[in-house]
Amino acid sequence: MRTELVSESGDPDRANEDFASVALPASGRGGALVVLDGVTPPKDATGCRHSVHWFTARLGGALTELTVSLPDVPLADVLGRAIARTAEAHASTCDLSHPRTPQATVVLARWSAGAVEYLVLSDSALLVESPDGTVTARLDDRLARLPRSARATDAHIDARLRNKEGGFFTAAADPAVAARAVTGTLPREEVRALAALSDGAARWVERFGRGDWADCLALIREEGAGALVERVRELERTHRGRGKRHDDATVVYVEL
């Protein structure tokens, strides 16, 4: 088995709000990966005294533990338990009902001798390569399908779309959101490799159009996860457009 993990802040003067881990149980059977992309809030109040990176570290740590310690519990239930545990850690000091309470996108994958399970919530990506080289992107595209006019202001997004029916969902303080994730299970023999990408790394495909998902996974496999992040940084330096010029970028690659 080959595993590779790269996570880099979009700004060296700011904490990385992504989280990534790979867990290989002591039994030597199976494993799991976790990628979280913390949602950077506007500069006004969030109702929480904690930072986004505090939240992603807490949630990511809980997910890393629970995905391997509860191998028979479905990933959506694992996510719900991890959200509840994280919420409990700051419920007494923070307003968890605030729409901008710390939150994150989620990618989980867990493999055993017989199956590969996955979960995707919001706009990070999981690439699945089959033995014949076919690459399938497992995505939660609800945010991407919203018209740009509906995303014109943060206030409108928070009031009408964020963790709302007809909008999109992130992992914040409500465990019920876990049921909204895109989930599935594949036979282990149908999966050769996995690559989980935060949207800062997925920009190579989604924003800059330098290749498709198969090209992206081939780049990671042949040149390494760091090469993808480096290519994204080069493109960010030369392209200007909507959104953050530089974003935290995370890649976890696993060959089964």
Question: PLM ranges: what are they?
Answer:
Residues M1-L256:
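PP2C/PPM-type serine/threonine phosphatase catalytic domain
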